[in-house]
Design a protein with these regions (language model features):
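Predominant activation on well-ordered alpha-helical scaffold segments within soluble catalytic domains
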Residues: 1-2, 35-39, 109-113, 140
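His/Asp/Glu-rich mid-to-C-terminal helical/loop segments that flank catalytic regions of hydrolases
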Residues: 2-12, 155-166
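Acidic/histidine-rich catalytic neighborhood of metal-dependent amide-processing enzymes
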Residues: 2-88, 134-135
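Active-site-adjacent substrate-binding region
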Residues: 66-71, 75-162
Length: 166
């Protein structure tokens, strides 16, 4: 985003904290910070914050758990990301059926895929382990709850949260 010269649309990076502990507090994405910030920004241009949020799209930069052949039980191999096969687009997250979930629309996923392909970005899809196998939380659900299109995009990580990650 730093190299983006004279963009046609507003571009921004939002950095937040507390993702691993529920995204609560005034620095977490589950706070009112993001909608208030966008509302203040929109007001400068004579726009309504809620309309700006609804028209926005977000790539949530979060890692994905790569398939681990030495600890394969939590993974569904055909739906897992692999190390060295590009960034991972994670269409949906959540557990217990559809609890705590975010699910990017097919249209938004299509636009992201097209963007990757047009810019020769190597990418893959993957889920965060077997459904209801535990883990798999991201901040995408908080962004989606604002009525914003969002998808998780990040690198696959082997042995996530272990003392030694790859």
């Amino acid at each position: 985003i730093l190299k983006c010269k004279d963009p046609k649309k507003t571009c921004m990076t939002i950095l937040t904290d507390k993702e691993e502990t529920g995204s609560d507090g005034n620095t977490g994405l589950n706070s009112s910070y993001l909608p208030y910030f966008i509302a203040d920004l929109a007001k400068v241009y004579g726009l309504e914050g809620r309309n700006v949020i609804s028209a926005s799209e977000c790539l949530s930069a979060d890692v994905n758990a790569a398939y681990d052949p030495t600890f394969s039980e939590p993974f569904e191999i055909r739906n897992s990301s692999q190390i060295n096969y590009g960034v991972v687009a994670t269409k949906f997250t959540g557990a217990r059926g559809k609890s705590g979930t975010s699910d990017a629309s097919a249209e938004f996923v299509g636009r992201v895929r097209k963007l990757f392909d047009e810019h020769n970005i190597v990418w893959q899809t993957g889920e965060l382990g077997k459904v209801d196998g535990g883990g798999g939380g991201t901040v995408a659900q908080y962004i989606a709850n604002l009525d914003m299109n969002v998808i998780d995009v990040g690198v696959p990580v082997l042995s996530m949260h272990a003392p030694f990650e790859i």
